[in-house]
Every structure is written in C-alpha cells, then in structure tokens.
C-alpha cells in the first residue's frame, strides 16, 4: 500500500490501445508481441493486458466439444476443479473462490474470445505472469513499466461488470488515506483506494470486448512500485462481510442453529435486551405439544429481590438435604457453589410444566404416560428456547435444581400447586464467546431396526 498523499493526478492521462497484436496461441511470446506493437512504451507507463491473452500464451486452454450441452458439461467440470469453494448460486451461475482467492463467476472459466472448440482458464499465477511480462519488456525495450493482468468481474449491489486487476507488478495496488485530512479538516479513517482496479477499468474503455484489442497502456499517472501484487487486493473470506451469498448464508444459519447452543457458565456483565428473550420465548412456544395444548410456562425472574429470595431458599434446602445424606461440610459447599451461576446470570427463566388440557385416565399406567408426554413437550420447548437464544447471540445454561425443590419454588413464587418446575435457565452474553460446536458421532447411539 502506498503512503498517504494523493493517489490521483490533476494532470491529463492517456489511455492508448495497442493495435496490431496477433491472435495468441500457446507458446507465443507475449512480451515480444507487445514490444513489437508498442515500441513507443516509456518509463512510468502501465501496460494493461487481459488475462485471456496471458492464458492463451501460457497454454491455459482446454479442448472442448462442439456440442453445446457437452461443452457446458465440461465447463462445469472445470469450474469444480478450479474452485475451492462456492459462495453463491443463482440459476446455473456459480460465484466461486479459486485457489488464489479470486471471487468471481465460474472460477474464471470462460468461453469468450477463444475458439468454439476451446475453453480458457485463468493463468496459474497472474502476479507471476505480470512480473514476467514486465521483465520481458524491460529486456526488449529498456523501459520500466508497470503491468496489470485483468479479468472481468461483477460487483455486489450493482448491475454490470467491470475489469479488475487479477495480477500486478511494478505499482502500488492500494493507496491508503488513513490519517490524511481533507480540505475541510476531516480525518480520513478508512479510505483505501484500489488503484490497480481503477486502472484496469479505465483501460477496458479502449480494449473493449469485441475489438480484438487485449492490451492497452495508461500513461500520465505517478506510479510507485512498493512491491505489492494483486493478491493484496483480495480480502480473505474470514474478514469479508459478504463471504457467502444470501441463500447460502441462510442455509448455513439453518444448519448451525442447533450447534450454536452451548452450556455457558460464565457471563459478561452486558445487559440482555428484553426483546431478545421475548422473541426466543415466542419461538419456543411453537414446540410440539400434545392435544393442541400449551403445556409450558416460562417464569422470568426479573425482580432481583424475588430471584435472590428463591435462590437463597433453594440453597438452604439443598444444604439440608446434603447434610441429611451425611456429606461433609466441604463437599456440601462445593455442591452448593454450583448454583452460583443463577445468582450471577443477567437473566433467569424457570420453565414450568402446566397440565392444562391433559387427559384423565382411570389407571396409573396411562396417567403416568400422559405426564411423560407433557414432560417431553416441555423439554422440547426448553430446547427451542435455548436455540432461540443462541441464534440471537445469547448464551444459556439449563440447570435442573428447581426440580428438586418443586414445592419451595411454587411457594416462593406464588404459583399454582399443579405447576411443576423443570429446571432453571441462566441467560446472558457469554464471557468467552464460542462458535458452533461439532456434531456428535451417533455411533451406537443411533439404533437401526
């Protein structure tokens, strides 16, 4: 990246076509052909050449069948071979990333401006191709020029294509204005100009697509060679805001939703927006339930004094129960300390089984089965709530403690006698955020009959 200063020029620039070039074939000397057609090149010029011309000279042509369907089948096979990942699909068009990090349609595989019995691939190393052409022109003409290898690309949010640099040598491909101040005194914090792409687009105005003019020269710019290449123009997928197409991003979100749920035991102090909890609860209430009922209620402990009173009472009961088991005091305190998460979490919600709509049976077996069915339904709603929180960036941890103190929970919270607490859910932003977990191997946990 070039240092701060103006990347443009107030003086006129020229964009000159290089006429008289042959139809290039594998093995041709591109540098010699350009030197012969443009002996007028001089120091500081920028030679802009289409990647197609470079590919032809470097033998990056693949024989293709004349039949349109077979040709298209081969093209798709080549796209698969050249691409390292697919970012987006629309109809039969694939937007891909190739091994160099270039993101464009069809991995640069192209059937234009080549024979109908051929398909062209991008150069293996466009930056190396640019450096080689620059060195060859220096050898033949004794001039110091910059070289850009270009290809046609679409642009996010805008119709139409433009040429962009895929290979570069001899010029600063980027110009950063960070720290510079404009004429109004405003500091330019993030402005960074893709000089190489601007030059590539300008040169295409004389190269065109149907003129058989694969090389142009841009003259009049102040070119600085900082050793950068076109690779510096590529933003890695991990840093790019648009590294997937819309449909693909939605699909990834669907596939990762379950995997985002983790048991988070340490939360940051950041407050939890109430609307996020309400939204997650609303989604959780769509979980499957028997008899078209709503067998779950979520009790949100929003009043700090109420939460503390409940947790203190549960702690006292837990201590008494453990002491009754004959456990030593040190062991009791370790076990009781595990419940501290419910004091520390920004929010706590208690899921309740509510038997409204449950069927009555004269025998214990079916009555127990009905209760089990309602319990499973509440469990489904709890899992749905945890996932709903996770997809909103909230961590959670389900803790079963209230199950062991059902009467106490009902008494402290003033709830009906037939409401059954099924644990407690601590909610907050994770102190140490983590990504989606890996799926488990079903192994012998998935039984086939």
From Swiss-Prot:
Residues where a divalent metal cation 1 binds: 110, 151
- Its name, as the record gives it, is Bifunctional F420 biosynthesis protein FbiB
Which residue intervals make up region (Coenzyme F420:L-glutamate ligase)?
1-245
Q: Which GO terms describe its biological process?
A: F420-0 metabolic process
NCBIfam families, per database record: F420_cofE, F420_FbiB_CTERM, PRK13294.1
Q: What does the record's cofactor remark say about binding? A: Binds 2 divalent metal cations per subunit. The ions could be magnesium and/or manganese. Monovalent cation. The ion could be potassium.
Originating organism: Mycobacterium avium (strain 104)
GO MF annotation terms:
coenzyme F420-0:L-glutamate ligase activity; coenzyme F420-1:gamma-L-glutamate ligase activity; GTP binding; metal ion binding; oxidoreductase activity, acting on the CH-CH group of donors, with a flavin as acceptor
| UniProt binding sites for coenzyme F420-(gamma-Glu)n | 321
Q: Which UniProt keywords apply?
A: GTP-binding, Ligase, Magnesium, Manganese, Metal-binding, Multifunctional enzyme, Nucleotide-binding, Oxidoreductase, Potassium
Q: Where is the segment annotated Dehydro-coenzyme F420-0 reductase?
A: 246-449
Q: Which domain of life does the UniProt lineage start with?
A: Bacteria
Per the record, the pathway is: Cofactor biosynthesis; coenzyme F420 biosynthesis
Binding of a divalent metal cation 2 occurs at 152
